[in-house]
Curated annotation (Swiss-Prot):
S-S pairs: none
A Pfam family the protein falls into: DRTGG
Class of this enzyme: transferase
Keywords: Acyltransferase, Cytoplasm, Transferase
GO cellular component, one term: cytoplasm
Subunit annotation: Homohexamer.
Free-text note on domains in this protein's UniProt record: The N-terminal region seems to be important for proper quaternary structure. The C-terminal region contains the substrate-binding site.
Protein name (record): Phosphate acetyltransferase
Biochemical pathway: Metabolic intermediate biosynthesis; acetyl-CoA biosynthesis; acetyl-CoA from acetate: step 2/2
Name of encoding gene: pta
Main function: Involved in acetate metabolism.
SUPFAM superfamilies named in the record: HprK N-terminal domain-like, Isocitrate/Isopropylmalate dehydrogenase-like, P-loop containing nucleoside triphosphate hydrolases
Catalytic activity: acetyl-CoA + phosphate = acetyl phosphate + CoA
Keyword Metal-binding among record annotations: no
Length: 704
């Protein structure tokens, strides 16, 4: 089931908070524990609570600390992005979101309010956040005073832009619409049939409900910081319009309209009394209240006259600012749904219930899980998965700066228990020079280890048939890579990561010698986890086997499918070639055909197809033409290349052209996990590879 939804507007004053209110009520009907999260709020000050968070928490009585319901203010978010810390922003938002996700069954997320001057910035920000949280999206469009065709075009453009960014738009709500019933049907049909999203779109049109967009006298009071002179019990009165009363009574009364707020200097007793009189007269419309400006109050005898009334019929407020400044400030006020305004809340909920099919929408959301995942989400999930059952990972290149910085991160984040190999004095000195805290990290100097002689004997026993003497075995165990691999072999470590300094051959040779391959597997191979903007694909073999045979290719495919499952990728395996189906001939194609046959024979439950060209494997439109009816073509997640030349070049091309994050190579087929780093690896690469190795170790132990 889906466990989240991101509601984003397309512009300001779309009535998004009313839709959020309705969605929360809908979710609480079917889901036991629902959290509310606004990644970005408008308030820069912590003294003032965000309006929508306050509304949802108070009305629904959600037991969530306010500090847990948001990550940044819009101002702070903008500063981080301007300082080149966009990744930090997304990482920290994801961490706060995950805290709620772990504790609740569903997280309802609300985007920014588009109250600033840079709508494009907010649109991009909301899209990035929704993508990195893995949320399906509800788009709320402002339909106020817009023609049907304009609404269709603008909403369609928004949906297409979000879809291009890899977002799963599940529903669009045209709110505050001022269209006819026929136009409403046109909007729904047009958007439903034109949408480019991968899943069907639910479209709803909610009519304008003027009372929700109008401020109350209480809103006016809060906005201006006004003092209430009279009518404390009538502050929920709606304000339809403003009128500045600076003329004589005879002229003023001609301008009185239903629901208007009369603004006048506080010493205009004539306007004050005539306003009160008009409210009591059936011949005049009902005004909403009086706002007295300039810090002036009515004369004492006027006060006495008003106080003599039994129940003052309207609220009377007083502000210190003069009339012109007051009206300027009021022009920026728009109506909000306050937690204590039951009338507005019930109006909003009733509107939502009348015009949105709650059963249909609830079913779409609760029974739906977005398959899209961003690189940051995948990396975050790697770390979290590794942390659940901490493994012991040995790093033979213990004095290398990148290794030490990665070890520091891994220990602080409790991703794995780290063992560093190397000269104890050298490693300790490097740690001190870098100012790192390595409490909890085990440093082992191979030749001084109490296990050294045991490891020498074990290696000699394993390799004596190859002519290795005891003295040669002792020399080998002085090599940290051999020593670390033996730690894994003997169960003193759960996995090893090396290669920041050493070559690939040096890293994996010891594993070939004595860890060896799993039963039924004759070949060690590798895959890259390719994190595209909206999904993770598995590419293999791109690093180890130059020209595998058909049988080896079949083994690589089966191993890659197991690796995919370990990392949460549902395997649909494409055996790649330069032709699709039976269209091509030649030795290379025949090898892939034979490999496909062998793989299907050995793993009949596996969704596997071949030969396929890359475009037919990844693009559904091409697949419909070249291989209609296939369960793999167009939706493959595991791509098996016929040789190293093709695989290595393709993964690098996709990495550069698509901006993909390539994690790997991840070795597969060994009895215990050993993984190789690129000599150009970054600290982040090392952290990810250790997490991957830890997860592989968990899988070997049956923990996942």
């Amino acid at each position: 089931m889906s466990n989240n939804l991101y509601i984003t507007a397309t512009e300001s004053k779309s009535g998004k908070s009313a839709v959020v209110l309705g969605m929360m009520q809908l979710l609480l009907r079917d889901v036991r524990k629902v959290a509310f999260f606004r990644p970005i709020i408008n308030q820069a000050s912590t003294d003032v609570r965000d309006h929508d968070i306050n509304l949802i928490l108070r009305h629904f009585g959600l037991d969530i600390a306010y500090e847990d319901t948001y990550a940044y203010s819009l101002q702070d978010a903008r500063e981080l992005i301007n300082n080149g810390q966009h990744a930090t922003l997304l990482d920290n938002i994801l961490k706060k979101y995950k805290k709620l996700e772990d504790a609740y069954d569903f997280v309802l997320c609300e985007g920014t309010d588009f109250l600033g001057k840079d709508a494009a910035f907010e649109f991009e920000l909301n899209a990035d956040i929704a993508a990195n949280l893995g949320c399906p999206v509800m788009v709320v469009a402002n339909g106020q005073q817009k023609a049907a065709r304009e609404l269709i075009a603008s909403t369609q453009l928004t949906i297409d832009l979000l879809d291009e960014k890899g977002l799963d738009v599940v529903t669009a709500v045209i709110n505050r619409a001022t269209v006819t019933e026929a136009e409403r049907e046109e909007i729904i049909k047009s958007l439903e049939c034109k949408v480019n999203c991968s899943n069907p779109l639910a479209v709803y049109v909610l009519p304008e409900e003027s009372t929700l967009g109008k401020p109350t006298m209480n809103d006016v009071k809060k906005w201006l910081g006004a003092q209430v002179l009279y009518g404390h019990g009538r502050l929920d009165t709606l304000v339809d319009d403003y009128i500045i009363a600076a003329m004589q009574i005879g002229n003023f009364l001609d301008y009185v309209s239903q629901g208007c707020l009369v603004i006048t200097p506080g010493d205009r007793s004539d306007i004050i009394l005539s306003s009160l009189a008009s409210r009591l007269s059936t011949a005049y419309p009902d005004i909403s209240g009086l706002l007295l400006t300039g810090g002036l109050e009515p004369a004492a005898n006027v006060h006495r006259l008003i106080e003599g009334w039994t129940g003052v019929p309207i609220p009377i407020l007083s502000v210190k600012d003069h009339t012109y400044k007051t009206i300027q400030t009021l022009n920026e006020l728009y109506g909000k749904i306050e937690p204590d305004n039951d009338r507005k809340i019930n109006t909003a909920l009733a509107l939502f219930e009348r015009h949105i099919d709650s059963s249909e929408l609830g079913s779409r959301l609760i029974n739906r899980k977005s398959s899209r995942i961003t690189p940051k989400m995948f990396e975050f999930n790697l770390i979290e998965k590794a942390k659940r059952n901490r493994m012991r990972i040995v790093l033979p290149e213990g004095a290398e700066e990148r290794i030490l910085r990665a070890a520091d991160i891994l220990v602080r984040r409790e991703v794995a228990d780290i063992i560093l190999l190397g000269d104890a004095n050298t490693v300790g000195s490097r740690i001190g020079d870098l100012g790192l805290d390595m409490d909890g990290v085990q440093i082992v100097q191979p030749n001084l280890s109490p296990k050294f002689d045991e490891y020498v004997a074990a290696y000699h026993e394993c390799r004596k048939k190859k002519g290795i003497s005891m003295e040669q075995a002792r020399d080998m165990m002085n090599d940290p890579t051999y020593f670390g691999t033996m730690m894994v072999h003997k169960g003193d470590a759960d996995g090893m990561v090396s290669g920041a300094i050493n070559t690939t051959a040096h890293t994996i040779r010891p594993a070939f010698e004595f860890i060896k391959t799993k039963p039924g597997v004759s070949i060690v191979s590798s895959v890259f986890l390719m994190c595209l903007k909206d999904r993770v694909l598995v590419f293999g073999d791109c690093a180890v086997n130059p020209n595998p045979t058909a049988e080896q290719l079949a083994e690589i495919a089966i191993s890659a499918s197991h690796t995919a499952r370990i990392f949460g990728v549902d395997p649909r395996v494409a055996m790649l070639s330069y032709s699709t189906g039976s269209s091509g001939k030649g030795a290379d194609v025949e090898k892939v055909i034979e490999a496909t046959r062998i793989a299907k024979e050995r793993a009949p439950e596996l969704l596997l197809e071949g030969p396929l060209q890359y475009d037919a494997a990844i693009d559904m439109d091409v697949a419909r033409t070249k291989l209609p009816g296939s369960t793999v073509a167009g939706q493959a997640t595991v791509f098996i290349f016929p040789d190293l030349n093709t695989g290595n070049n393709t993964y690098k091309a996709v990495q550069r052209a698509a901006g993909a994050v390539a994690i790997g190579p991840v070795l597969q087929g060994l009895n215990k996990p050993v993984n190789d780093l690129s000599r150009g690896c970054t600290v982040a690469d090392i952290v990810n590879t250790v997490a991957i190795t830890a997860i592989q170790a968990q899988a070997e132990k049956g923990l996942i």
